[in-house]
Amino acid sequence: MQTMYLALGIFLLTYVLMLTLQKYRPTIALSSALIFIVLGLCGVFDFRPLDALAAVDYNVLLMIAGTMGLVTLFIDSRMPAYLAEQLIVRVPNVKWAVTVLALFAGVISAFVDNVATVLMVAPVGLAISRKLKISPVPVLIAIAVSSNLQGAATMVGDTTSMLLGSYAGMNFLDFFWMQGRPGIFWGVELGALASLVALLVIFRKYTEKVAAAVETQVSDYVPSALMIGTVALLIVASFLPEPSDPTLKAIYDLRSGLVCVGLCLIGIVRDCIRKHSGGTFLRVLKDLDKDTLLLLFGLFIVIEGIRVAGVIDAAADLFYNISGDDPFLLYTLIVFASVVLSAFIDNIPYVATMLPVVEGIAALMNGGAGLPPYVFYFGLLTGATLGGNLTPIGASANIAAIGILRKNGETVRLRDFLRIGVPFTLSAVLAGYIYIWLVWGI
């Protein structure tokens, strides 16, 4: 029991430090991981260095790294800005222009990191705002919250989706259709439809005509082909049978990550040869979110450390006792607790921590006989992903959008964000909450 409290204390201190010293989150997570390893070597925990290395989900890290590299090439090709402009010239007024731009950001975000999506689409939103002489603040906020929503739609849309997919043994297609039922993708899309109505109401007074033209020229179509190829190969990888040979099994477990990294390397090498320069490789390396990769590496070890110490089981018991073996009450608690918590804390460490807790709770349900955990997994992902839209600091995409606005001399007040974030989040969460329970909970 004392070792469990020690592990819990280290974990809570780690979390508090990551919240207060966000710039140093990777260092804090790695330091905490090292503490668990040292305590394991000292015999305090049954936790060896090999256990720590085995706890790291290398498939997730490879997927994140490869996807980020592809996104850099995709942005450089100017294809996202070109597509956005093509959409804008076909709408009747500013209300629809902003809404369509937000929806477009959502579609892109289903396959591209949320922050990268904001960086892609924000310049188009700024240009439209300048032409029409309207404030870009609500436009970029709408883009940010929409990209956060759709990040949960597919396995490659966001880090939290990658974490869920890998932890639950889901493949790319399982997000669309799994075990004879519609997957979480359709719940996210229902949430998108509900939030579309919210956006149209919010921007109902923006009735000015749009006088825009397609000015962007695509410089390279190969990155777009690589993005499409990534999705296609992930689908193919979903159908590959699991091998029995241990070596092949290890490669099989990394298949999604290897697809993303492999196509990224093809794009980099091809661009370096085409330009007779290594600049593309250096730019991709510079744009790689090394902080997130190091943060996750450390967190995987920390979470395994607290699992070995019994903290995960104790947390599962606590949730189970609160819900009283009522699956619907537990599902509701997970969804809305995740919404509230993710409004103030980063959803990546939250989801990474809660996945094993949710699995443990599901095993205790039904009088100890256990229940399939998927309804609780999907509730966790929905609440954690959308909860970030409640506040300006709840998601990295929001912070990125606000940073762009400030660089352009705009002031973003809390009420400006809440005016869009709250109705958007509530409408999307409720739609997804009802859908997931009707499809997976009954």
Where are these regions (language model features)?
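Hydrophobic transmembrane alpha-helices of multi-pass small-molecule transporters
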Residues: M1-D76, Y82, G180-D317, V412, ...
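Transmembrane alpha-helix interface/packing and boundary motifs in multi-pass membrane proteins
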Residues: V16-K23, F104-D113, A144-V156, F336-Y350, ...
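Residues that define the loop-to-transmembrane-helix transition and helix capping
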Residues: P26, N59, K95-W96, V137, ...
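Alpha-helical transmembrane segments of multi-pass membrane proteins, especially transporters
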Residues: A29-S32, F36, M68, V98-A105, ...
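Membrane-embedded alpha-helical segments and adjacent helix-loop junctions characteristic
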Residues: L50-V137, T292-G367
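Re-entrant/interfacial helical elements at transmembrane boundaries that shape
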Residues: L83, A116-A127, L140-I141, T154-M170, ...
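Membrane-core helix-loop-helix motifs of multi-pass transport proteins
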Residues: I128-S224, G368, P372, I399-I434
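C-terminal transmembrane helix pair
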Residues: W177-G187, G298, L329-I442
